[in-house]
Amino acid sequence: MLIGILSKKYVKEILELLNEKGELHFSQIHKEIPTHMSSLNRTLNELVKLGLISKRKEDNKQALPKTYYKLTPLGKKALLLYEVEKIIENSKNNQNIIIQIINGKNHNIINAKIVNIHNK
């Protein structure tokens, strides 16, 4: 389930890292994410299974091939949910929130407008 995985520890950081840096191999991700290798591997595999990131192996004739991970278009959309969460958490109880998500070919934008109920 998408919401379930997005609430797991380090998922937001992994998605943001891949969004910022592009394709990274496992050890590059591990340098940035302070968790056990087995936990990171499990989380990355869950993200791959849900289609939020893609995975490819590069066989460079060494003992172990490097595994690379990259954010998918669905993963970029999932990052928008963190923005929506932030907007909702920062709103006051007596206000309605109007959220417009624009997902164009080359951009993702969230416009949020907080409207006071009493002014309607």
Curated annotation (Swiss-Prot):
Gene3D superfamilies in UniProt: Winged helix-like DNA-binding domain superfamily/Winged helix DNA-binding domain
One Pfam assignment: PadR
Disulfide-bond pairs as recorded: none
Organism superkingdom: Archaea
Family: To M.jannaschii MJ0361.
Protein name per the record: Uncharacterized protein MJ0944
Organism: Methanocaldococcus jannaschii (strain ATCC 43067 / DSM 2661 / JAL-1 / JCM 10045 / NBRC 100440) (Methanococcus jannaschii)
